[in-house]
Amino acid sequence: STPFDLKSVELLVRLGLKRLKLPSGEITNAPLLLKAASTGKPVILSTGMSTFEEVADALGVLAFGYLGDGRVPCVKAFKKAYASGAGRETLKGKVILLHCTTQYPACFRDVNLRAMDTLRSAFSLPAGLSDHTEGIAVPIAAIARGASVIEKHFTLDKLLPGPDHMASLEPDELKDMVMAIRNVEEALGSPVKKPADGEIENIAAVRKSLVASRPVRKGESFTGKNISVKRPAAGA
């Protein structure tokens, strides 16, 4: 669940949540980030509206909070925590970044899904997508690009008042999205290039072999005039 203030963090801890979701609007809220990290719980951090530098700064605050070495919190200490080996290792086990376009609904041209790849490679952290586009195409594409987490708003009726509902999925759509994602995950399969088990039985029928294109006399040489290539692969 998502806390928007310090007391909400405490409430979620008391409720026994295993992970905290920090929204895009709080990425510059250092006290909230510190409070979340001080619980020791893993966090999912949305990065909508953020620059690359702001994401790095937020990770510094989280690293400082997780390390909890008693130093006075300040920008210098945050940067030092993020630059330290201990800080980076702690973040790897605690933080997932979500690329996000904070727009309701988000336009496809503004999604910039490749930025999710940038977050993953630049910060060496798992990355996913908090999606506000209409439909389910973008979350499915994100999974194909290696997203670790998909966040999608859910509603019982898109016509309800408020900015979130029109960018949310109704029950049947959510079911379709999950099923499509599971299919894509299965289809991603292995990076090893080899025939799939289901292909083996088709090799003989689909590939071709050399066959005589006309009667060949004993002792006659094979040439392009008396042989051809045809299915199945049961000839020479």
What are these regions (language model features)?
Residues 1-236:
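Catalytic cores and adjacent flexible loops of soluble metabolic enzymes
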